[in-house]
Amino acid sequence: MKKLIVLTGAGISAESGLATFRDSGGLWEGYQVEDVATPEAWRKNQELVLEFYNQRRKAALEAKPTRGHAILAELQNYFDVIIITQNVDDLHERAGSRNVVHLHGSLFESRSTLDPTLTYKIEGWELNRGDKCERGSQLRPNIVWFGEAVPMMETAAQIAATSDIFLIVGTSLVVYPAARLIDYVPDQIKKYV
């Protein structure tokens, strides 16, 4: 079976009603990105950051996968599909996709502020102040914030390099380093944007 690697972005989930940062004139659900999606925001106001992500998680739980999500899942019948998504929702998985790499993390996981390798599933939609890891540090959303390194980038680059077909859906390729993934795809491989 040919290996189909799919890079997805916010555009595939937007039809589900989930807000996207790029389409909101610099505001993200009414917030400046600097106030809710940076390490500095976390240090300044953990309550605000937690509430922001709790609301995003709640919205994601209420959203339904789009036809685009379903089509990508159906392609598993014909290809060895790996989805590399910039999205932090779980709509690909709920549509039936089995092999999804979340480049920027997941709304449905938390991680230790002391040890980022300690990650935990979030049951329900709330992560609160006082929720701690086994080592006693506050849990934060397991999301890559602006200004942070992308831990899954090397894995994603290795996957992109193995593709027989590379498909890009719902992203304008302006968010780095994800936009650079296409550079890892061998020159002779078909790329569809």
State what each model feature region is.
Residues 1-193:
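Conserved catalytic core of sirtuin-type NAD+-dependent deacylases
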